Amino acid sequence: MKQDVTVELTGGKKLHFETGRMAKQASGAALVTQGESVVLATAVAAPDPKEGIDFFPLTVDYREYAYAGGRIPGGFIKREGRPSEREILTSRQIDRPIRPLFPEGFRNETQVIALVFSADKENDPDIVGINAASAALALSDIPFAGPVGAVRVGYVNGEYVINPSYAERRDSSINITVVGTMDGIVMIESGSAEVPEEVVLGAIDFGHTEIKKIVAAINELAAKAGKTKRAVTAPEFDEAYFETLKNKIGARLADALDTKAHPKTESYALVKQIKDELAAEIPADENAGAAKKKLAHYYELLREKIFREQVTKDRVRPDRRGFDEIRQITIEVGVLPRTHGSALFTRGETQALVTATLGTNDDSQRLETFEGEQKKRFMLHYNFPPFSVGEVGRMTGVGRREVGHGALAERAISAVLPGEDESPYALRVVSDILESNGSSSMASVCGASLALMDAGIPLKGAVAGVAMGLVKEGDEYAILTDIAGAEDHYGDMDFKVAGTRKGITALQMDIKISGITGQIMREAMEQARRGRMFLLDKMDEILAAPREEKSKHAPQIRTVQIPTDKIRDLIGPGGKTIRGIIEATQVKIDVDDTGRVNIASSDEEGLKKALAMINDLTAVPEVGKTYLGKVVRLAEFGAFVEIFPGTDGLLHISEIAEHRVKEVKDELHEGDQVMVKVLGVEGNRIKLSRKAVIREQRQKLGLPEPGAEAPAAAEGQPRAERAERQPSSNASTITIEGGEDFDDFDEEGGEGEGEDENFNREDTPNSAPGERRPGGAGAAGNRGRRRRRGRGRGPGQGGGGNRGPQ
């Protein structure tokens, strides 16, 4: 029978929970809708416990179907393949908050599946999926100490926003996912733009208020349609056996766990030796297997009890550090000769070799998302080989843990990357963990920051990360800075915080207990801030700022902005032009729709050559700027000068020289190189002047104007013979080839006679309508010689004036 419930969150967004219509054979199923995003989650557990295991076999799978966003999958297969990185990360976000809420000793295989059936471009289905999974478990017969609720909190214009849309998230300085119960927070996942701790804490508190509404709604639905939970028998605790074991080897085991006296590998060997000695004492009979299993279980419980009592009662850590003390730091940069940037970051017995590689825009990762196709230009990959913990293992594909740790470090660094305008590189950072004893993801953050600075990437600030732990027994608790492996394994909290001196860029928190108070959270954040400052000081001692020069092995990128209407000219028909540049210069060229062109090469000469070719192809003449051009054609009224490849301008006869030019061919010839200034640009018409360049050069050299120092005429000499005859200032009749009667030129001395007002560089005088051609051939065909009335002017003032009196 269908049942549903709706909850309205702050801001007006609604979550609708429904059950009883779909997937009715699952132990629990919930269809959850927000906006037009719809997710079905199911929960199923095997009827019987799985034999021979000492852990809870939980599997969580979150899948996003392409049809949910109205897409057909790309590629040849045309169906969904293996999980994407986003699907893996969301699966982990569902798994981490629910796993601690199953009862101890529950060993039945359990599977939670969340399927995205519909996704709009406003509501991210990942939050819907977490809530759907929680509801499915609450409705099922599977024992579960939930439900949990999940929200995303943004911070836009000083206001917190619940479940912000994709557009709002782009304007938000925080992107934080908060999951909790009625009593407290159980998981946090966050990326932020160097925000203060108080802003993050405010977002968590704000989110928890909304979480309580969601939990109440799920409880209401479970009350209507939920199944009776299975009975789970709590594992028996043999107090006598445990005390006997403690009295027998407790002191030896405590000494073996002292990692100040014994390094990690030696400590592990001593712990194993004690256990092997106890196992050897077990009689080899039919009960030996069960006895060894019982020994292993209680031996592990004793290790945990020793650790927790030392921390909460004795107030000491396994390696005898203070609660807020960070292990010894060793840093090297530039450790690899051919990489673009590298750093070796060692913290205690955790070591990360981090490299940075610079690429072009073509190297960016292309993603298909519900928002549409996107490009990701920064990637951080985390590798955890088995030798890092002294073990033997298979080197197969990347595991979920590696994907999750890499994503956390990536978020931490993303906030300080320069904009594409400042640094157009695609960036790939790889962290290879060479040794591990806790906090390897935070070592990756520190190493990544150093490697990028070593590569010359202008980060906004250095980023450091520290992992915090918590051990809580009743009202007693201890917050630990820079937790090691045992403190992570036996502690109650793993709280990773990364950021700069200005604020937090990423954090991740997982809780193994039912929840922590706001006071504990604030203390942990402050302790993490002090630890982060200590690490940043250590990093600054080695490399305080990005290197000014990039590696000689890294590609050099030059960026040029071209007009969007020039993109076609650069690419050419079928890409012929751009391919020709690439082949001639051996560079990489990337052009986007905005006209932004990135040219990349490790060869400086090839880069310069390609840049010059692109500038020539796409240059736009600027009024008032001088260019070196080539005379490509002569005409009666002037010359056509090519100032860029394929771009001609008209050098009118009146603008060729300061003196009167009778014939263009007397001054210029085809193929001549001339300096010209752009007087004006009207559409495709470019007006050029050589006279202006000559005048500027003469004035610069301090030379007089032509004719300014002519000798005085002898007294009595006829006036007409004392100076060069000038054109009459009175109206005169001038004969031209073809055309109609019109003024010689405009008031600014632009075009003169013979220039058609529709001139452009694609047209020629022999083909353009209305242009004057020898023999009287005009736009309408051959015409007789026509006469027009013009206004005579002095030399250099216009086309008519240059022709002189008739």
From Swiss-Prot:
Its EC number is 2.7.7.8. Keywords: Cytoplasm, Magnesium, Metal-binding, Nucleotidyltransferase, RNA-binding, Transferase. Residues 555-614 form the KH domain. Pfam families: KH_1, PNPase, RNase_PH, RNase_PH_C, S1. Residues 793-806 have a biased composition (Gly residues). It comes from the Bacteria. The keyword Metal-binding applies. One of its GO terms (molecular function) is 3'-5'-RNA exonuclease activity. Residues 698-806 are annotated as: Disordered. The keyword RNA-binding applies. Residues 758-774 have a biased composition (Basic and acidic residues). It is an enzyme of class 2 (transferase). Residues 704-717 have a biased composition (Low complexity). CDD domains: KH-I_PNPase, RNase_PH_PNPase_1, RNase_PH_PNPase_2, S1_PNPase. Its cofactor is Mg(2+). Belongs to the polyribonucleotide nucleotidyltransferase family. Involved in mRNA degradation. Catalyzes the phosphorolysis of single-stranded polyribonucleotides processively in the 3'- to 5'-direction. This is Polyribonucleotide nucleotidyltransferase. It comes from Acidobacterium capsulatum (strain ATCC 51196 / DSM 11244 / BCRC 80197 / JCM 7670 / NBRC 15755 / NCIMB 13165 / 161).
